[in-house]
């Protein structure tokens, strides 16, 4: 570093003799200090090359995925996935035999489209991609980690996007909700993700009474109400309360049995109300009269 300092001072002063005595600095050191290495799109391409290389080890592919995801947290880099034609290879990893790679691919998809309408639209250009993620979320044979990441990806794909939400519904997305919410062995995190996905769809589609009836018919409402209990995770309770508020706002009319169950379950939440979202709690309280 001292050598670099002497060289830079002499060079700035135009003292060729002093600069020569100091000696030329290490090019690698200059690159580290002042940049000039591979640009981020090139790093993205290199990472994907490792991921797609059949000779690369799984560990090396996981490192490449970590690097790729870190890069596409930047909005411009996320949008460059389409420009660099990297969506197709990324989506193909959803069918990898390696569970960890499927999980990483889902995580990258979810991060790339998060609050990014352009990347959402780019993802939707790929036929069958939505269906693949829905199936990963649906499969009981998949690990909890993969399924939870699938719900994460789906939530970010549909959020504030009417076309994506409609495609999700058309591909049978609503049918995966009730089984996840009812299954006793399903982790709380996945249930929270599932309800977050459902509320994103409801909001994006500006759901009407007919859509809310669909939620009832598919047993999603029934499965959700099972989690209105003081022993449940507060975040899970919040999601259910928010679902009720959204359904009411869409014009849904709850029947006598439903109102009775909601009222009884809601009353049991009083001891934990300070842990819950105040707005949704009060909105449901007002709804019940």
Curated annotation (Swiss-Prot):
One GO term of the biological process aspect: regulation of translation
ARM repeats: 13-56, 75-114, 118-159, 162-203, 222-267
PROSITE patterns named among the record's database cross-references: ARM_REPEAT
Tagged with keyword Repeat: yes
Entry similarity comment: Belongs to the FES1 family.
PANTHER family linked: HSP70-BINDING PROTEIN 1, PROTEIN FOLDING REGULATOR
Role according to the record: Functions as a nucleotide exchange factor (NEF) for Hsp70 chaperones which accelerates the release of ADP. Required for fully efficient Hsp70-mediated folding of proteins.
Name of the protein this chain belongs to: Hsp70 nucleotide exchange factor FES1
Species for this entry: Eremothecium gossypii (strain ATCC 10895 / CBS 109.51 / FGSC 9923 / NRRL Y-1056) (Yeast)
